[in-house]
């Protein structure tokens, strides 16, 4: 059920962003061909869910200084057994920020990214097939979780001060498509 729902979202995204054909095709192939794609236990890689959280005024985004990776990125994480990808992104947003009043601006995908996670003490190197959603927080009062070194509301026009990653900068550009849309 959740794989079928994810595939619908992926196909809609592919139609909206035809210049991302290669990433979309790789992601769709993975979800279609591996029934365990939503399970963290799949060692070669698995679907993850993350979120681009805008403040109430929509001029800042909440980023985490990720404890394991040591970089500033959007909040997100793994799906818990049988969870829908949008529900997982919303759960991760609330857990990692401590902000209870976060809601989707759109249920459509904001962005897709497939990236390598380096080997660590618990896991071999593997791929994250990250599905990203656009959310808005009802307040700016966050609490730092154990997964973060820090959290920050970053002005959208100063995003490059925190990250030069294409996948981060790309979400800033795409948010307007979903907001207007």
Please describe what each predicted stretch is.
Residues 98-141:
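Active-site segment of metal-dependent pyrophosphate-handling enzymes
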Residues 59-95, 99:
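Conserved Nudix-box catalytic region and its N-terminal flanking loop in Nudix hydrolases
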Residues 46, 66, 78, 126-128:
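Histidine-centered active-site/metal-ligand motif
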Residues 132, 142-173:
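NUDIX/MutT-family hydrolases
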Residues 14-50:
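Acidic, metal-coordinating catalytic segment for phosphate/diphosphate chemistry
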Residues 53, 134-136, 155:
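Short, well-ordered beta-strand micro-motif
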Residues 1-26, 97:
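Predominantly extracellular/luminal regions of secreted and cell-surface proteins
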């Amino acid at each position: 059920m959740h794989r079928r729902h994810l595939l619908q979202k992926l196909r809609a995204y592919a139609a909206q962003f035809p210049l991302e054909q290669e990433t979309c095709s790789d992601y769709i192939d993975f979800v279609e061909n591996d029934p365990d794609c939503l399970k963290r236990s799949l060692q070669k890689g698995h679907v993850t869910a993350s979120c681009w959280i805008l403040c109430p005024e929509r001029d800042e985004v909440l980023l985490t200084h990720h404890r394991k990776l040591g970089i500033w990125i959007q909040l997100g994480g793994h799906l818990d057994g049988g969870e829908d990808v949008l529900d997982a992104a919303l759960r991760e947003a609330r857990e990692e920020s401590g902000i209870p009043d976060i809601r989707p601006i759109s249920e459509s995908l904001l962005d897709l990214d497939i990236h390598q996670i380096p080997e660590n003490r618990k896991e071999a190197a593997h791929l994250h097939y990250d599905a990203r959603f656009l959310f808005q927080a009802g307040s700016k009062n966050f609490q730092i979780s154990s997964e973060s070194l820090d959290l920050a509301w970053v002005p959208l026009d100063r995003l490059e001060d925190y990250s030069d990653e294409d996948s981060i900068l790309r979400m800033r550009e795409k948010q307007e498509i979903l907001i207007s849309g």
